[in-house]
């Protein structure tokens, strides 16, 4: 009888060990996924920053262009 109980206990312990091993593997996979997603997020943020800088340069260029056009229009008004 006690041998039977010991075998049942051994089976439960083995099942627990197997479950722990599987959970450890899952944790490692999740860590790898998290690292990859973190890297993707950093790249996306860097790309966003570059796009924002490019947009600001375009706005600055447009403002300069508009100022030059206003200056030229002002000179044309003076000529007329």
Curated annotation (Swiss-Prot):
Its main location: cytoplasm. Keywords: Cell cycle, Cell division, Coiled coil, Cytoplasm, Septation. InterPro entries: Cell_div_ZapB. Disulfide bonds: none annotated. It comes from the Bacteria. Residues 3-80 form a coiled coil. GO terms for biological process: division septum assembly; FtsZ-dependent cytokinesis. One of its GO terms (cellular component) is cytoplasm. It holds the Pfam family ZapB. Residues 49-60 have a biased composition (Basic and acidic residues). It is found in: Cytoplasm. Residues 41-60 are annotated as: Disordered. Non-essential, abundant cell division factor that is required for proper Z-ring formation. It is recruited early to the divisome by direct interaction with FtsZ, stimulating Z-ring assembly and thereby promoting cell division earlier in the cell cycle. Its recruitment to the Z-ring requires functional FtsA or ZipA. Belongs to the ZapB family. Homodimer. The ends of the coiled-coil dimer bind to each other, forming polymers. Interacts with FtsZ. This is Cell division protein ZapB. The gene is zapB.
